[in-house]
Amino acid sequence: MSQAPGAQPSPPTVYHERQRLELCAVHALNNVLQQQLFSQEAADEICKRLAPDSRLNPHRSLLGTGNYDVNVIMAALQGLGLAAVWWDRRRPLSQLALPQVLGLILNLPSPVSLGLLSLPLRRRHWVALRQVDGVYYNLDSKLRAPEALGDEDGVRAFLAAALAQGLCEVLLVVTKEVEEKGSWLRTD
Protein backbone atom coordinates (compact mmCIF):
# COMPACT_ATOMS: atom_id res chain seq x y z
CA MET A 1 0.00 0.00 0.00
CA SER A 2 1.53 3.34 -1.01
CA GLN A 3 1.47 6.51 1.04
CA ALA A 4 -0.38 9.65 0.09
CA PRO A 5 1.88 12.39 -1.32
CA GLY A 6 3.37 14.44 1.51
CA ALA A 7 2.40 11.90 4.18
CA GLN A 8 4.96 11.11 6.85
CA PRO A 9 6.16 7.50 6.98
CA SER A 10 4.90 5.72 10.06
CA PRO A 11 7.55 5.19 12.74
CA PRO A 12 8.90 1.67 13.10
CA THR A 13 7.31 -0.63 15.63
CA VAL A 14 9.85 -1.17 18.38
CA TYR A 15 9.24 -3.99 20.88
CA HIS A 16 9.76 -2.68 24.42
CA GLU A 17 9.00 -4.51 27.67
CA ARG A 18 8.56 -2.43 30.82
CA GLN A 19 10.11 -3.27 34.19
CA ARG A 20 8.35 -5.81 36.41
CA LEU A 21 9.78 -7.18 39.67
CA GLU A 22 13.54 -7.73 39.24
CA LEU A 23 13.17 -9.16 35.74
CA CYS A 24 15.40 -6.67 33.92
CA ALA A 25 17.52 -9.53 32.50
CA VAL A 26 14.40 -11.13 30.98
CA HIS A 27 13.24 -7.74 29.66
CA ALA A 28 16.70 -6.99 28.23
CA LEU A 29 16.77 -10.35 26.42
CA ASN A 30 13.30 -9.88 24.94
CA ASN A 31 13.98 -6.24 24.05
CA VAL A 32 17.27 -6.99 22.31
CA LEU A 33 15.61 -9.87 20.41
CA GLN A 34 12.56 -7.68 19.65
CA GLN A 35 10.01 -10.27 20.75
CA GLN A 36 8.87 -12.08 23.87
CA LEU A 37 10.94 -15.25 23.87
CA PHE A 38 11.74 -15.48 27.58
CA SER A 39 9.69 -15.40 30.76
CA GLN A 40 10.51 -15.57 34.45
CA GLU A 41 9.76 -19.30 34.31
CA ALA A 42 12.16 -19.82 31.40
CA ALA A 43 14.89 -17.88 33.22
CA ASP A 44 14.29 -19.93 36.39
CA GLU A 45 14.67 -23.14 34.34
CA ILE A 46 18.00 -21.88 33.01
CA CYS A 47 19.08 -21.18 36.61
CA LYS A 48 18.21 -24.77 37.56
CA ARG A 49 20.24 -26.12 34.63
CA LEU A 50 23.22 -23.94 35.59
CA ALA A 51 23.18 -25.09 39.23
CA PRO A 52 21.16 -28.33 39.34
CA ASP A 53 22.27 -29.46 42.80
CA SER A 54 22.13 -26.08 44.50
CA ARG A 55 19.59 -25.42 47.25
CA LEU A 56 20.10 -21.67 46.98
CA ASN A 57 20.59 -20.87 43.32
CA PRO A 58 23.49 -18.42 42.86
CA HIS A 59 22.15 -17.17 39.51
CA ARG A 60 18.99 -15.42 40.78
CA SER A 61 17.45 -13.64 43.74
CA LEU A 62 16.77 -15.68 46.84
CA LEU A 63 13.31 -14.09 46.94
CA GLY A 64 12.31 -15.53 43.56
CA THR A 65 11.77 -12.10 42.03
CA GLY A 66 14.43 -12.39 39.32
CA ASN A 67 17.69 -10.44 39.55
CA TYR A 68 19.38 -12.93 37.18
CA ASP A 69 23.13 -12.87 36.60
CA VAL A 70 25.10 -12.78 33.36
CA ASN A 71 25.30 -16.59 33.16
CA VAL A 72 21.53 -16.75 32.64
CA ILE A 73 21.70 -14.19 29.83
CA MET A 74 24.58 -16.02 28.14
CA ALA A 75 22.87 -19.42 28.42
CA ALA A 76 19.59 -17.99 27.09
CA LEU A 77 21.35 -16.57 24.03
CA GLN A 78 23.32 -19.79 23.46
CA GLY A 79 20.04 -21.70 23.44
CA LEU A 80 19.01 -19.57 20.44
CA GLY A 81 22.28 -20.10 18.58
CA LEU A 82 23.55 -16.66 19.56
CA ALA A 83 26.48 -15.55 21.67
CA ALA A 84 27.28 -12.80 24.14
CA VAL A 85 30.76 -11.32 23.77
CA TRP A 86 32.20 -9.17 26.54
CA TRP A 87 33.34 -5.77 25.27
CA ASP A 88 36.78 -4.84 26.61
CA ARG A 89 36.32 -1.30 27.94
CA ARG A 90 40.00 -0.55 27.20
CA ARG A 91 39.32 -0.73 23.46
CA PRO A 92 38.25 2.40 21.63
CA LEU A 93 34.57 2.22 20.65
CA SER A 94 35.61 3.02 17.07
CA GLN A 95 36.79 -0.63 16.87
CA LEU A 96 33.26 -1.92 17.48
CA ALA A 97 31.83 -3.22 14.18
CA LEU A 98 28.20 -2.33 14.92
CA PRO A 99 26.79 -3.73 11.63
CA GLN A 100 27.95 -7.19 12.81
CA VAL A 101 26.20 -6.84 16.19
CA LEU A 102 22.55 -7.84 16.63
CA GLY A 103 22.25 -5.75 19.80
CA LEU A 104 23.93 -4.84 23.05
CA ILE A 105 23.10 -5.63 26.66
CA LEU A 106 24.58 -3.37 29.32
CA ASN A 107 24.84 -3.96 33.04
CA LEU A 108 24.69 -0.60 34.80
CA PRO A 109 24.44 0.70 38.32
CA SER A 110 20.90 1.94 38.89
CA PRO A 111 19.49 4.08 41.70
CA VAL A 112 17.09 2.47 44.16
CA SER A 113 13.86 4.15 45.17
CA LEU A 114 10.84 3.40 47.31
CA GLY A 115 7.96 5.17 45.63
CA LEU A 116 9.02 8.81 45.33
CA LEU A 117 11.85 8.43 47.84
CA SER A 118 15.31 7.91 46.31
CA LEU A 119 17.67 5.88 48.46
CA PRO A 120 21.46 6.35 48.47
CA LEU A 121 21.89 2.81 47.11
CA ARG A 122 22.67 1.44 43.68
CA ARG A 123 21.76 -1.95 42.26
CA ARG A 124 22.75 -3.59 39.01
CA HIS A 125 20.36 -3.24 36.07
CA TRP A 126 20.32 -4.89 32.62
CA VAL A 127 19.57 -2.62 29.63
CA ALA A 128 19.20 -3.51 25.93
CA LEU A 129 20.26 -1.41 22.94
CA ARG A 130 19.11 -2.39 19.47
CA GLN A 131 18.91 -1.03 15.95
CA VAL A 132 15.46 -1.04 14.33
CA ASP A 133 15.03 0.29 10.78
CA GLY A 134 18.38 2.09 10.85
CA VAL A 135 17.88 3.78 14.23
CA TYR A 136 19.47 2.61 17.48
CA TYR A 137 17.24 2.61 20.56
CA ASN A 138 17.80 2.49 24.29
CA LEU A 139 15.30 -0.18 25.37
CA ASP A 140 15.80 0.19 29.12
CA SER A 141 12.80 -1.46 30.76
CA LYS A 142 12.64 1.41 33.27
CA LEU A 143 11.85 3.87 30.46
CA ARG A 144 8.22 4.58 29.57
CA ALA A 145 9.05 4.17 25.87
CA PRO A 146 12.09 3.36 23.72
CA GLU A 147 14.59 6.22 23.51
CA ALA A 148 16.02 6.88 20.04
CA LEU A 149 19.82 7.16 20.12
CA GLY A 150 20.18 7.77 16.39
CA ASP A 151 22.83 6.27 14.16
CA GLU A 152 26.12 4.51 14.99
CA ASP A 153 27.60 7.76 16.29
CA GLY A 154 24.65 8.14 18.66
CA VAL A 155 24.99 4.65 20.09
CA ARG A 156 28.77 5.05 20.44
CA ALA A 157 28.20 8.32 22.35
CA PHE A 158 25.70 6.56 24.64
CA LEU A 159 28.17 3.71 25.24
CA ALA A 160 31.04 6.14 25.88
CA ALA A 161 28.95 7.99 28.49
CA ALA A 162 27.89 4.73 30.18
CA LEU A 163 31.45 3.38 30.26
CA ALA A 164 32.80 6.71 31.57
CA GLN A 165 30.56 6.40 34.64
CA GLY A 166 32.42 3.22 35.56
CA LEU A 167 30.94 -0.06 36.77
CA CYS A 168 29.35 -0.59 33.35
CA GLU A 169 29.71 -3.88 31.51
CA VAL A 170 28.80 -4.30 27.84
CA LEU A 171 27.79 -7.55 26.15
CA LEU A 172 27.60 -7.74 22.36
CA VAL A 173 24.82 -10.01 21.14
CA VAL A 174 26.06 -11.67 17.96
CA THR A 175 25.58 -14.79 15.86
CA LYS A 176 27.85 -17.76 16.50
CA GLU A 177 29.55 -17.11 13.15
CA VAL A 178 30.35 -13.50 14.09
CA GLU A 179 31.65 -14.69 17.48
CA GLU A 180 33.88 -17.37 15.93
CA LYS A 181 35.30 -15.05 13.26
CA GLY A 182 35.70 -12.16 15.68
CA SER A 183 34.06 -9.93 13.08
CA TRP A 184 32.40 -7.81 15.80
CA LEU A 185 35.79 -6.10 16.00
CA ARG A 186 36.93 -3.77 13.21
CA THR A 187 40.42 -4.49 11.96
CA ASP A 188 41.03 -1.19 10.12
UniProtKB/Swiss-Prot annotation:
Q: Describe the reaction catalysed, as an equation.
A: Thiol-dependent hydrolysis of ester, thioester, amide, peptide and isopeptide bonds formed by the C-terminal Gly of ubiquitin (a 76-residue protein attached to proteins as an intracellular targeting signal)
Major place of residence: cytoplasm
One GO biological-process annotation of the entry reads: protein deubiquitination
| Active-site residue list | C24 (nucleophile), H125 (proton acceptor)
Q: Which SMART domains match?
A: Josephin
Report the subcellular localization: Cytoplasm, Cytosol
User: Gene Ontology terms, cellular component aspect?
Assistant: cytosol
Q: Which PROSITE patterns match?
A: JOSEPHIN
All residue ranges annotated as the Josephin domain in the record: 11-188
- Give one Pfam family: Josephin
Listed A to Z, the keywords are:
Cytoplasm, Hydrolase, Protease, Ubl conjugation pathway
Molecular-function GO term, any one: cysteine-type deubiquitinase activity
> Enzyme class, one word?
hydrolase
The record's annotation in InterPro entries points to: JOSD1/2 (IPR040053), Josephin (IPR006155)
Its EC number is 3.4.19.12
Q: Could you tell me what this protein does?
A: Cleaves 'Lys-63'-linked poly-ubiquitin chains, and with lesser efficiency 'Lys-48'-linked poly-ubiquitin chains (in vitro). May act as a deubiquitinating enzyme.
| Protein name from the UniProt record | Josephin-2
- Supply the source organism for this entry: Homo sapiens
